[in-house]
Curated annotation (Swiss-Prot):
GO terms for cellular component: cytosol. This is Leucine--tRNA ligase. It is found in: Cytoplasm. GO terms for molecular function: aminoacyl-tRNA deacylase activity; ATP binding; leucine-tRNA ligase activity. PROSITE patterns: AA_TRNA_LIGASE_I (PS00178). A motif ('KMSKS' region) lies at residues 627-631. The lineage of its organism: Bacteria, Pseudomonadati, Pseudomonadota, Gammaproteobacteria, Pseudomonadales. It comes from Pseudomonas syringae pv. syringae (strain B728a). Gene3D superfamilies: 2.20.28.290, 3.10.20.590, HUPs, Isoleucyl-tRNA Synthetase, Domain 1. Keywords: Aminoacyl-tRNA synthetase, ATP-binding, Cytoplasm, Ligase, Nucleotide-binding, Protein biosynthesis. The keyword Aminoacyl-tRNA synthetase applies.
Amino acid sequence: MHELYQPREIEAAAQTFWDEQKSFEVSEQPGKDTFYCLSMFPYPSGKLHMGHVRNYTIGDVISRYQRMLGKNVLQPLGWDAFGMPAENAAIDNNVAPAKWTYENIDYMKTQLKSLGLAVDWSREVTTCKPDYYRWEQWLFTRLFEKGVIYRKNGTVNWDPIDQTVLANEQVIDGRGWRSGALIEKREIPMYYFKITAYADELLESLDELPGWPEQVKTMQRNWIGRSRGMEVQFPYDQASIGEAGALKVFTTRPDTLMGATYVAVAAEHPLATLAAQGNPALQAFIDECKGGSVAEADVATQEKKGQATSLFVEHPLTGEKLPVWVANYVLMHYGDGAVMAVPAHDERDFEFATQYGLPIKPVVRTSAGDQTPAPWQPAYGEHGELINSGEFTGLTFQDAFDAIEAALVKKSLGQSRTQFRLRDWGISRQRYWGCPIPIVHCDTCGDVPVPEDQLPVVLPEDVVPDGAGSPLARMPEFYECSCPKCGAPAKRETDTMDTFVESSWYYARYASPHYEGGLVEPNAANHWLPVDQYIGGIEHAILHLLYARFFHKLMRDEGLVTSNEPFKNLLTQGMVNAETYFRMETSGKKTWINPADVTLERDAKAKVISARLTSDGLPVEIGGTEKMSKSKKNGIDPQTMIDQYGADTCRLFMMFASPPDMSLEWSDSGVEGSHRFLRRVWRLAQAHVTQGPSTGLDVAALSDEQKAIRRAIHQAIRQASQDIGQNQKFNTAVAQVMTLMNVLEKAPQDTPQDRALMQEGVETVALLLAPITPHISHELWKQLGHNEPVIDAGWPAFDASALVQDSLQLVIQVNGKLRGHIEMPASASREEVEAAARVNENVLRFTDGLTIRKVIVVPGKLVNIVAS
């Protein structure tokens, strides 16, 4: 065994062994417990970042631990390879997205392998390859024929920079999530998944996921947004509208109906179109509204604007005429594109009515009283007893709901209804680098799905996009085809699918990635699925995780899987943060500086007191810790860390610095500390191994000192097992090993018993660290005399008898202050402990002249004597 810890050699040897032995390639083994651990697959952006390292290390620790429990563990990896960044990079570098993507995959795969991940690379999937997306197209055609996918014109978020449609979730503060461009509204034909047909199940089956963070489930519940309310009809005022009919609105607060003072409609509503005839000002306002975002979150925060029309509707219960307004806060695609406005009890209506001088009529007595003066108070929206509501005055919320519902039903002007905030998922993208939509447009036959024997519709990979819309729409050699039904000349669909489609089912393909008879091989899929542990960032709580749950139910209904949910347990890892530094330019712009280019000055307590740019020695501003990013220039290259310290050091730091679900603050000194610890482990093992083999341990013959050492070993096993296996607190598991190391480093190695005990101790360190620092553990286990690799060694079981103590050392306090210790038999009663404490020399000294009022005994820990 080499005297010095040499991570480069150790890690290369371990990885070569795993590769040659195909250690992590698995197959179905009926009768053996399985564990499917999956971290969200990466986009091949070019290089790993520390977020990747943390994500995949967490998954690897869990996978290796479960393997040591004797389970058949699947941990696959692949590439979420379609998407706009590849197109943008291709435009910038004049290279085909396929070439850029495959080169990035090769480089990043090498980086991932250098981390020593226990991944079954034989199951690698790449979503931009035809052998993957062929099955996506296959499922698309089946769902299209069933009506689960349909085509219609829709108002969409159009990104003018990326020249594509964005889902509502991809619009942030009115801007595209990737380009940052202001979003426009457009009407175009699109393909939609009918996710709303599964809204109830998606909502209710969240209760079947106890292993998911409550925060994620709440976010999904809110996004699905089921609400019970009423559809209310406001009859048209025929004198102003010129025809019979009624305006339909949905409300969750029918109890406030008597407080409605106007109605508001979306810019696209037929009444808005009617009112705009001959009204240029109103038409201009409608056009302005149509240019805004269709994302509900943006509408909620934007300035409320409106235009009056000359139209009126009638209140369904009183017959009072209510004016019709066109308002930018009403969405055509939500509800019926119209709202009944009750300004006294709805914040948006209140803001709008205040701005335009519309009546505000309180009809609910709230904790704020009977009036609703400006500014808006949250109390105005409370449920309460009705006031100013005619025959309904005095009723509470539910009684008022029921009574007003009955009155409306009697007049055929209302009915109960359940509504969802969730909208159908529009998946058409006017981009090149995505999965082609397998539809042919025929003048005679309409939209015809491509037959299974003609799949896949292959995306040409030699295209270099220029950024002006979809290249496929300008490629006759791609879109010119014959109709599969009638054989007439037809046109292939040139839109591609939203890349969230690929990531909605990849976890299932891993179960049988080479299967050519379908999307999944059912036996393999049902052997491995659902995923036991899924790991990824909370930023995917709504988009990816909701879509994957939806897809799993689609696959279940197609008979491909039998389970209802894709992921049993979900761990949302925290971000990796690092210090930021900048200089403020005269223009007010911040120029960010890489931490590696900054020299820090610290005080005696290691607190940073100044920062200077190394190159010129002049001060820079300290910006605080923020998520590692290219824009802030505070990212750390994982490859640099691996080359300098080794993968085990990086893995250890990532697991020790913070619990996995919390943010981690990068620290160079923390990395160095992790490296020093591994050197200590190596030195201890090297010193032990150098003395030659040890004899077996005679537990019955252990001295008290040796029992204490063995107790520390088994306390570490018990606690680390709980920390890793139950709590997923890898940082405290590492802390247990560090505590054990402190004991072992002081332990004597004089007798055969000492050496046998040290053998057990060092073996335990190697085993407990094996999931976290697998390379050094691999080498230590071999050097400790074992023929089988540590990955095939079982997780250590603690010996309960080793934890039993004959005697305990208890802390003695007088009035809460430490005054000494006493040693007592472990079996001593509370009375015996108190009696011993009362006659302790220090207790007598510090209670001299005082009266003991109370004795508090905390069993096994301390005695506190209260005296005055």
